[in-house]
UniProtKB/Swiss-Prot annotation:
It is an enzyme of class 5 (isomerase). It catalyses: isopentenyl diphosphate = dimethylallyl diphosphate. The gene is fni. FMN binds at A62, M63, T64, S93, N122, K184, T214, G258, G259, A280, G281. Belongs to the IPP isomerase type 2 family. Its cofactor is FMN; NADPH; Mg(2+). Keywords: Cytoplasm, Flavoprotein, FMN, Isomerase, Isoprene biosynthesis, Magnesium, Metal-binding, NADP. InterPro entries: Aldolase_TIM (IPR013785), FMN-dep_DH (IPR000262), IPdP_isomerase (IPR011179). Homooctamer. Dimer of tetramers. This is Isopentenyl-diphosphate delta-isomerase. Its EC number is 5.3.3.2.
Length: 349
């Protein structure tokens, strides 16, 4: 019951605290192309995360589940939207259903709505190999997300306080998983060092989950009597984290998430090196406040606008979009300079 109540609290406070939009994409400028030699009608948006092929560089990221009828209904609607647009979709942490079997329906509903969809299971880094297998089987998942949420847990009144052995548990899951494993942050970004550690234990896909979207420190602080306000601005911005990711030179696929709301955000994230992008809080707000048809329409517009931007840049495919010239400036540039990461290759390609 406590876990289910927390799931509902997260939805309420995620909506009320909103998205900070401090993602850093304002520091990224495309170099205009007056002769793009492209046609809107020939633009294609297919992409891949590792060996997993996706029809769009936009997918519905982990939001909820395990909170009774309300979360079941949300996942049901999101699965419908995913089916309509042929998008991949992740569910929220399934630990609730592993602890209480009655909550499994709030996750299984997605497969009923969209039998042939691409779905990602989701568990925290405390999960065992056996729990990971159960989560994947529960929704017949195509991949498994393992989320890292140290700051959220520390801010959460009833959260974890011990984070030893996480990398070793992830390694065991990677070695034993029958589906690809994606390790993700939840809005605090990832450093290049973290990603190098993950790559060293066999992780091949990372969702950088940067600062700039739903702020789970702020969400958990709403649930506390004494706020840990020093965590409210903690983290690495999304744009910065993507560049840190690409600087590792590992054979990794990257998902960009964290405050992404527009087609321009998507285009910039991919041009910086992401393979795909993920939306959560922005889609949830539209669904809850404006309804499912409005969300369907918004995703249509995102795809249209992304193709307009790609046409302007002369990028006919997502792979070509990853090679267009851009300039990194402002606070993002200064951060990366201090971190010893050269950004001039973006502007000179």
């Amino acid at each position: 019951m406590v876990r289910a109540k927390r799931k509902l609290d997260h939805i309420e406070y995620a909506l009320s605290t909103g998205q900070s939009r401090t993602h850093g994409f304002h520091d990224i400028d495309f170099v205009h192309q007056s002769l793009p030699n492209s046609s809107y009608e020939t633009i294609t948006c297919e992409t891949k995360i590792g060996e997993l092929s996706l029809s769009s560089p936009i997918f519905i990221n982990a939001m909820t589940g395990g909170g009774g009828e309300k979360t079941l209904h949300i996942n049901e609607q999101l699965a419908y939207v995913a089916k309509h647009h042929n998008l991949a979709m992740a569910v929220g942490s399934q630990m609730a259903a592993l602890k209480d079997e009655s909550e499994a329906a709030s996750y299984k509903i997605i497969r009923k709505v969209n039998p042939n969809g691409i779905f990602f299971a989701n568990l925290g880094s405390e999960a065992t190999v056996e729990q990971a297998e159960l989560a994947v089987d529960m929704i017949e998942a195509n991949a498994l997300q393992i989320h890292l949420n140290v700051i959220q847990e520390l801010t959460m009144p009833e959260g974890d306080r011990d984070f030893t052995g996480v990398l070793q548990r992830i390694e065991k899951i990677v070695l034993n998983s029958k589906v690809p494993v994606i390790v993700k942050e939840v809005g605090f970004g990832m450093s290049k060092e973290t990603m190098q550690q993950l790559a060293s234990v066999g992780v091949t896909a990372i969702d950088i989950g940067g600062q700039g979207g739903t702020n789970f420190a702020a969400v958990e602080n709403e649930r506390r009597q004494r706020m840990l306000s020093y965590f409210n601005n903690w983290g690495i911005q999304t744009a910065t984290s993507i560049i840190e990711a690409t600087s590792t030179n590992n054979n990794l696929s990257f998902i960009a998430s964290g405050g992404i709301q527009t087609a321009l955000d998507v285009a910039k994230a991919i041009a910086l090196g992401a393979n795909t992008t993920a939306f959560a809080g922005y889609f949830l707000r539209i669904l809850m406040e404006d309804g499912i048809e409005k969300l369907v329409d918004e995703i249509d517009l995102l795809h249209t606008d992304l193709k307009f931007i790609m046409t302007a840049l002369g990028a006919k495919t997502i792979e070509e979009l990853q090679s267009v010239p851009l300039v990194v400036k402002g606070e993002t540039y200064h951060w990366l300079t201090q971190r010893g990461i050269d950004t001039t290759h973006y502007s000179r390609r």
